[in-house]
C-alpha cells in the first residue's frame, strides 16, 4: 500500500473572482510578450477570451479547441500551433482540462516528443516554458 504522495506545482497558479484584474501583471511578471491562450469553444463564445485579450499588453494567438477529456490528437494540434507561433508564455483559460491540455502541449513542444510518449509518471524530460 502506498504511504506517501508527491505534489508538483507551478510556481504560480492564479485563479478566483477578480483574476482578470490581475492577468496583465501576472503575464508581464513572467516576461510575456507573445502569449498563446489555450481554452475551449464555450469560454471563447462567452467572450471571456476577448476580455483577457483586451487586458493583456502582448501579441496573442488563441487555441480554442479544448475538450472535456483532452485527447492526444488535441494536444498534437495545439503543439503544432505553439511551434508555429513561438510563444514565450502560455495561458490556460478554463478548468482542469484546459490546464492539462496546456501543460501537455508545452511539454510536447519543449521535449520535441510525441504527446503519447509523455503520458505516465516522470515522462516529461525537463522544465517547460512559462505556463
Regions found by a protein language model. Name each.
Residues 73-131:
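Glycine/threonine-rich beta-strand-loop-alpha-helix active-site module
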Amino acid at each position: 500500500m502506498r504511504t506517501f504522495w508527491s505534489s508538483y506545482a507551478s510556481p504560480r497558479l492564479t485563479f478566483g473572482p477578480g483574476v482578470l484584474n490581475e492577468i496583465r501583471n501576472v503575464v508581464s511578471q513572467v516576461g510575456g510578450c507573445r502569449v498563446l491562450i489555450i481554452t475551449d469553444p464555450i469560454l471563447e463564445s462567452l467572450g471571456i477570451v476577448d476580455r483577457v485579450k483586451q487586458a493583456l499588453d502582448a501579441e496573442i494567438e488563441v487555441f480554442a479547441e479544448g475538450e472535456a477529456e483532452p485527447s492526444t490528437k488535441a494536444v498534437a494540434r495545439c503543439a503544432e500551433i505553439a511551434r508555429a507561433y513561438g510563444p514565450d508564455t502560455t495561458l490556460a483559460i478554463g478548468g482542469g482540462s484546459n490546464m492539462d491540455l496546456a501543460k501537455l502541449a508545452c511539454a510536447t513542444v519543449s521535449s520535441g516528443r510525441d504527446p503519447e510518449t509523455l503520458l505516465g509518471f516522470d515522462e516529461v524530460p525537463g522544465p517547460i516554458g512559462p505556463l
